Every structure is written in structure tokens, then in C-alpha cells.
Design a protein with these regions (language model features):
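Conserved alpha/beta-hydrolase
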Residues: 45-63
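Gly/Ala-rich beta-loop-alpha elbow adjacent to hydrolase catalytic centers
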Residues: 96-100, 104
Length: 253
């Protein structure tokens, strides 16, 4: 795990009152940890809701562990966590960053949520030689993240705990999940907030526009974060994003 992990809270979190009227599931990104969505959870808890942020399968372990996880396992884990919240709360919402955003959209397409917010969600990968990925990963299964995480604030980037290697098998699983989500966007009906950093070098801003246009939600809003990269909750626009997400969840969840 790279980053100054010893100085930050990167484990799963459960914030706010257990008996709050509504609960929000907060889902992190690929190779990341709950740390990167914790600021959103803290704002949601301050708004009077419960916020639960689990670690997705293969995370908080090793890149090798992550490489063996299939996209259906991520979705099943997210679905189970949401069902647990639904069992004890009248209303539930879901918030996701990147991979977590894809999972949030998949859950919303199942009609399982009352509100949704997604951040930096990649509908497609824009990687050179992408069709060769299955062959490349057989000889080079991991790619080192030499530049660290896609965060524009240097101090925040240094603190950010994540794997320092990306399993190419996990990239293939991400692509499979992207295809599933693209096919189901029109089935998303819950009020949605789509947020995206304009300096995001991982997920193209066009993906945010496509999500906003393709979902079936009657209430939809887009929020552009001008000074942030991909991991917006811990980047320069983090406080602005957290306030918007908490307001959205408190209004609709």
C-alpha cells in the first residue's frame, strides 16, 4: 500500500447515528481504500444520516489478491452491503467514486436506491492498445503506478493510500463492469448527482455528460470541480464536493 497510510484512516467506516432515518453506502475506487470516500461519509453523517464505507473485495490486502477478483464479486459485495442498510433504514442512498461510481449506477439500475451520487466515473477506458490487454497481461500482469494517484494537490497525493501496482486482470474486470453499466443507464431512476474533476486524467469528462444524459432520472444535476483530478473527495475541491453530496443525500434519501 503506497502513500503515508500510517497517518490516515483507510479502513472501513460506519459514521452517524445507527438509527438515522436514512443510510448512504459509500464506495471507493479501484486499488483504493474507504479513505478516499471518507470525507463524503463525514459530511453525510453531519447532515444527520448514517454513512457506511466498506472495503471492496481484493482491497486492503495485496495487488495479487485484487487480481483474482471478478467484477461480479464487487457488485455482489456492494449489493449485500446495501441490503444490510435497507434492512435497518427506511431510505438508502449510494455514493461512489470511479469503480464505486460504476457499482452505484449498477445498484441504482436495479431500483435499489432512493438517491445516487457518482464521482469521476469512467464509462470507457481510453488506453492505447486496449485490445491487446489480454495478451499483455499474460507477460506483464501488473503495471506500476509511477506517478501515484490522480490527485492534483501534492500533499493529498502523498497521503493517499492505494496499491502501487495496478493488476491488468482488474482492468479487464473493470471493462466488463463498464459494459454492464452502459447497457443499464436508462434504468437508473433515482435522483442523481454526477460530479467530475475537470483535471481528471483517468476518467474523461465526457463520461459524466453521457451519464447525465443517459439515465432515466427525473432529477439530475452535474457538478464540475475545476481544480481537481480523479480522486476529488481528497483533492482541492473536496470540501465543495462533500457539501454537495451531503445536501443531495439529505434531500432525497
Amino acid at each position: 500500500m503506497s502513500g503515508a497510510a500510517e497517518r490516515v484512516e483507510f479502513d472501513a467506516f460506519d459514521l452517524g447515528a445507527p438509527d438515522a432515518r436514512a443510510a448512504v453506502l459509500c464506495l471507493h475506487g479501484l486499488t483504493g481504500t474507504p479513505y478516499e470516500v471518507r470525507p463524503l461519509g463525514e459530511a453525510i453523517a453531519r447532515a444527520g444520516l448514517r454513512a457506511f464505507g466498506p472495503a471492496l473485495p481484493g482491497h486492503l490486502r495485496t495487488p495479487e489478491d485484487l487480481s483474482r477478483v471478478r467484477h461480479g464479486e464487487w457488485l455482489e459485495a456492494a449489493r449485500d452491503a446495501l441490503e444490510d442498510l435497507r434492512a435497518t433504514h427506511r431510505r438508502v442512498g449510494v455514493v461512489g467514486l470511479s469503480l464505486g461510481g460504476l457499482l452505484s449506477l449498477a445498484l441504482a439500475a436495479e431500483g435499489a436506491v432512493d438517491a445516487i451520487a457518482v464521482v469521476g466515473t469512467p464509462l470507457r477506458l481510453r488506453i492505447p492498445l486496449l485490445p491487446l490487454l489480454p495478451a499483455v497481461r499474460r507477460v506483464k500482469p501488473f503495471v506500476r503506478k509511477a506517478a501515484g494517484s490522480d490527485i492534483r494537490d501534492a500533499d493529498a497525493r502523498a497521503r493517499h493510500p492505494s496499491y502501487d501496482r495496478m493488476p491488468l486482470a482488474s482492468v479487464e474486470q473493470l471493462r466488463a463492469l463498464q459494459g454492464l453499466v452502459r447497457r443499464r443507464l436508462a434504468q437508473v431512476r433515482a435522483p442523481i448527482l454526477v460530479a467530475h474533476g475537470l483535471l481528471d486524467a483517468t476518467a474523461h469528462p465526457d463520461d459524466a455528460r453521457v451519464i447525465l444524459q443517459a439515465v432515466g432520472s427525473a432529477t439530475r444535476e452535474i457538478l464540475w470541480l475545476e481544480s481537481s483530478g480523479h480522486v476529488v473527495p481528497v483533492d482541492r475541491d473536496g470540501p465543495r464536493l462533500a457539501a454537495a453530496v451531503a445536501m443531495h443525500c439529505a434531500r432525497f434519501a
